[in-house]
UniProtKB/Swiss-Prot annotation:
Its main location: membrane. This is Olfactory receptor 2T3. The chain crosses the membrane at residues 31-54, 63-84, 106-125, 145-163, 201-224, 242-264, 278-297. Gene3D superfamilies: Rhodopsin 7-helix transmembrane proteins. It comes from the Eukaryota. PROSITE patterns: G_PROTEIN_RECEP_F1_1, G_PROTEIN_RECEP_F1_2.
Length: 318
């Protein structure tokens, strides 16, 4: 009986993957772990607070802030899908993940990545409607339209996850099962396959082009029209207001699309596994930290709502 159980456990262990993690073979693993843990807490707190502010402050019940709250929710889920497993594994010494766990992690990651790309396109269209079509804005971006746009973003993201995850996990992995990443990322996992994945890589490349092309076209068109309108404005105050409205969103767009292009569209010969891991860490850990800061520190409405919430809490304690 014991021998049978041990054999079963060994077979299970042999099918598990090993995640490299950010701290592998580092002389400063403790320092890196502490910094990562603090960034994780900052991102959780910042995004949760942003969602709470938007939902509790009536002045923030607008389409723009509705989309920002969805972006914050996606960032929270990004963090919870990838980072806790790495942090716990570093403490317990268990860096393994089962094939089913790997597939689940990959599905949620791809779903969130796809949904966020389309959400940024929806946010760009919202900024276009606000700046270029102010009189029609209440009709163009009413509550039903906003809910439909967000639902479409989630559905399209799920389609991405449902298409790529089963195919990736169906390949035989007969080389080393050590994934050179801190989570189950498609490019890192494909490097472990002993079968020919060149056709699938081409299909994945085309899928990424289609997934990024439509949002890029919407974002580019929206900001081209916005910049054209700004150029025609005679008011300096109008210039500043229009640019302030769009600048925060453009920063997030450049961060996310730059990282996505590097990871999924640049040929693997142009970057190493270590560089891939750093880029992955940037947009799964650092970007969720930056998003609340970009949207709060640069936004008077959010800072005003935060001060109002803090004052009301202090008055309640008195």
């Amino acid at each position: 009986m014991c021998s049978g159980n041990q054999t079963s456990q060994n077979q299970t262990a042999s099918t598990d993957f090993t995640l490299t993690g950010l701290f592998a073979e580092s002389k400063h693993a403790a320092l890196l772990y502490t910094v990562t843990f603090l960034l994780f807490l900052m991102a959780l707190t910042g995004n949760a607070l942003l969602i709470l502010l938007i939902h509790s402050e009536p002045r923030l019940h607008t389409p723009m802030y509705f989309f920002i709250s969805q972006l914050a929710l996606m960032d929270l889920m990004y963090l919870c899908v990838t980072v806790p497993k790495m942090l716990v594994g570093q403490v317990t010494g268990d860096d393994t993940i089962s094939p089913s766990g790997c597939g689940i992690q990959m599905f949620f990651y791809l779903t969130l990545a796809g949904a966020e790309v389309f959400l940024l396109a929806a946010m760009a269209y919202d900024r276009y409607a606000a700046v270029c079509r102010p009189l029609h804005y209440p009709l163009l971006m009413n509550q039903r339209v906003c809910q439909l746009l967000v639902s479409a973003c989630w559905v399209l993201g799920m389609v991405d996850g449902l298409l790529l995850t089963p195919i990736t996990m169906s390949f035989p992995f007969c080389q080393s099962r050590k994934i050179l990443s801190f989570f189950c990322e498609t490019p890192a996992l494909l490097k472990l396959s002993c079968s020919d994945v060149s056709l699938y890589k081409t299909l994945m490349y085309l899928c990424c082009i289609l997934m990024l092309l439509a949002p890029i076209m919407v974002i580019s068109s929206s900001y081209t029209l916005i910049l054209h309108l700004i150029h025609r404005m005679n008011s300096a105050a109008g210039h500043r207001k229009a640019l302030a409205t769009c600048s925060s969103h453009m920063i997030i767009v450049l961060l996310l699309f730059g990282a996505s292009f590097y990871t999924y569209m640049l040929p693997s010969s142009y970057h190493t596994a270590e560089q891939d891991m750093m880029v992955s860490a940037f947009y799964t850990i650092f970007t969720p930290v930056l998003n609340p800061l970009i949207y709060s520190l640069r936004n008077k409405d959010v800072t005003r709502a935060l001060r109002s919430m803090m004052q009301s809490r202090m008055n309640q304690e008195k």
